[in-house]
């Protein structure tokens, strides 16, 4: 699902180098989805569910994923902020699961976490380039941070036990 917010920026990236970088990241994120889908498929077998059932649940809204994957990316700074801070938060939460007792999940996370480090570095590079740019580019960074901050914090859990995914 990590590819959803950034895929729009593949054709809009400001340079060929940036286009290749974001394209590689989106491709990695699609691979992460495939790895995790295989793990989920295996866990669903005892319940008689298939990949098709899972996809139907996703498309109809019965099954959801983290709210950041539903947010639009309005600017190039958003693409950078996702890589730098959202993928950075994912690294923190996912590395805590590297020792999971379920082997297929632990193995998938090893690859995912290794690749997420590159994604965070890529995002940081975008943000640093914008920070060294014009006042408008720096304002774009601030707007992006303001937009993504609250959803980013949800990677670490809700603010209180009264907070839910629909709050």
What are these language model-derived features?
Residues 104-166:
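A contiguous pocket-lining binding segment that forms or flanks enzyme active sites
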Residues 25-57, 123-128:
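Conserved alpha-helical segments that form or flank metal/cofactor-binding pockets of metalloenzymes
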């Amino acid at each position: 699902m990590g590819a959803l917010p950034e895929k729009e920026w593949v054709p809009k990236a400001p340079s060929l180098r940036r286009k290749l970088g974001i394209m590689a990241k989106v491709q990695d994120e699609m691979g992460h989805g495939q790895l995790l889908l295989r793990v989920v498929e295996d866990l669903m077998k005892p319940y008689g569910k298939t990949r098709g059932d899972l996809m139907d649940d996703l498309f109809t809204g019965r099954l959801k994923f983290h709210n950041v994957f539903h947010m639009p990316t309005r600017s190039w700074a958003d693409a950078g902020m996702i890589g730098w801070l959202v993928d950075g938060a994912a690294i923190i939460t996912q590395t805590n699961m590297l020792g999971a007792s379920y082997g297929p999940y632990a193995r998938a996370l090893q690859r995912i976490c290794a690749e997420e480090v590159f994604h965070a570095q890529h995002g940081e590079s975008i943000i640093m380039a914008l920070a060294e740019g014009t006042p408008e580019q720096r304002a774009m960074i601030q707007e992006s941070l303001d937009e993504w901050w609250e959803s980013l914090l949800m990677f670490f859990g809700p603010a209180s036990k009264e907070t839910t995914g629909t709050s």
